[in-house]
Amino acid sequence: MSSTIFGEQLPKYSRVEYVGDVPIVEECPRDVKTINGEPPLLFGKWSFENVVVRDPGLRRYICLKPVVLPHTEGRYQNYRFGKARIPIVERLINLMMRPGRNAGKKHKAYNIVKRAFDIVYYKTGQNPIQVFIDAIVNTAPREEITRIIMGGIAYSVSVDVSPQRRLDLALRWITEGARACSFNNPKPIEECLADELVAAAANDPKSYAVRKREELERIAAASR
């Protein structure tokens, strides 16, 4: 296999998978093992085994590659659909680095997510990775609206949402809900994030992300 693609040097020990005609670079196989032969545990605690994505449309875009430290150093940013190969927990960590005053503070965001997963386990007794995946599935919208212009008049029409955008919106709303909960609130943000994940996984309307999904789908249904 060539070590370049589109004239760009690939990372060492990488391989290329193709989605149609689109090359997707993956640095190492998904069945990577540690020295003792066991799959890596997220944060040294949580197993990726038996984690199920119940929405078939999202399975292809949720990366559940076993990792201890979810940090890819931006190596997929220059590849089309590269974020489909970023561990899904890292995408959550990256979105916790907003707004601008938190930009670049990845270690802080990492600790927030790590503590939030501990709280999720204490509250539910379930694998927090599975709770997180269920939260994504329950908050990913299936319809949204777009504006079209016909005869000089703008109309709002309902359209289906692509799987990648469904995932992007779900992650955005989950992190927005955690920040909104912790604003002017003595409750720490990791506890707010844990509450948001638990509520979203249960499809509870108390979840900010669930309410946003229902609102968007209601507007889209009225625009059919």
Swiss-Prot record:
GO terms for cellular component: small ribosomal subunit. Pfam families: Ribosomal_S7. Keywords: Ribonucleoprotein, Ribosomal protein, RNA-binding, rRNA-binding. One of its GO terms (molecular function) is rRNA binding. One of its GO terms (biological process) is translation. InterPro entries: Ribosomal_uS7 (IPR000235), Ribosomal_uS7_arc (IPR026018), Ribosomal_uS7_CS (IPR020606), Ribosomal_uS7_dom (IPR023798), Ribosomal_uS7_dom_sf (IPR036823), Ribosomal_uS7_euk/arc (IPR005716). The keyword Transmembrane does not apply. One of the primary rRNA binding proteins, it binds directly to 16S rRNA where it nucleates assembly of the head domain of the 30S subunit. Is located at the subunit interface close to the decoding center. PANTHER family: RIBOSOMAL PROTEIN S7. Belongs to the universal ribosomal protein uS7 family. Part of the 30S ribosomal subunit. This is Small ribosomal subunit protein uS7. The gene is rps7.
